[in-house]
């Protein structure tokens, strides 16, 4: 059975950058965001239920889910957010567990932004946190997504605090620095962790 390394971090922490460095080394990954998009793909049963609940205005002209419109809707309505989570989370969890079970590599990177919040830590053998300051989170997220600060702050408030996330960490990569200057350091850190995780996987399956 594949050894599972859970990769998590708050909004704007650079999880994708770190995940890509692992995939450059040939490590397979199961990405919660990808799975979340798959379960609400065009013409899927779950998307039909979402449209039934929220109306067709949460669809794009192509009939796909308009994630920004849906995010705006649920962030302002706690009951709608609860309904949506109750619909999606079980389906996403099952799909992720299925994908993890299919992996045959020594270890698999399990990329989940809300790993701790959604109580998915039990699926992991080890947890790697990409850590940045709240100030970096705000600046990066605003620059990347064109989101306003208020919406980013709401997203940050819905996630566990930096301190709480670090309590769960077995390993930490600090990603506060600008990527251009920090890339060699990140590559070295990821390579070291890669060797370590291969050893851990070997020990587990011995």
Curated annotation (Swiss-Prot):
The catalytic activity of this protein is classed by the Enzyme Commission as 2.7.1.24
Q: Name one GO cellular component term.
A: cytoplasm
Among the Pfam families in the record, one is: CoaE
- CDD domains referenced in this protein's UniProt entry, alphabetically: DPCK (cd02022)
- Which pathway does it serve? Cofactor biosynthesis; coenzyme A biosynthesis; CoA from (R)-pantothenate: step 5/5
Q: Where is the DPCK domain?
A: 4-204
Q: Name one GO molecular function term.
A: ATP binding
Q: What is its main location?
A: cytoplasm
* Keywords on record: ATP-binding, Coenzyme A biosynthesis, Cytoplasm, Kinase, Nucleotide-binding, Transferase
Q: Which reaction does it catalyse?
A: 3'-dephospho-CoA + ATP = ADP + CoA + H(+)
Give the UniProt record's GO annotations in the biological process aspect. Answer: coenzyme A biosynthetic process
Kindly list the positions annotated as binding ATP. Answer: 12-17
InterPro entries (alphabetical): Depp_CoAkinase (IPR001977), P-loop_NTPase (IPR027417)
Protein's cellular compartments: Cytoplasm
NCBIfam families assigned to the protein according to its UniProt record, in alphabetical order? dephospho-CoA kinase
Q: Record's family?
A: Belongs to the CoaE family.
Q: Which PANTHER family match?
A: BIFUNCTIONAL COENZYME A SYNTHASE-RELATED, DEPHOSPHO-COA KINASE-RELATED
Role according to the record: Catalyzes the phosphorylation of the 3'-hydroxyl group of dephosphocoenzyme A to form coenzyme A.
Q: What is this protein called?
A: Dephospho-CoA kinase
Its gene name is coaE
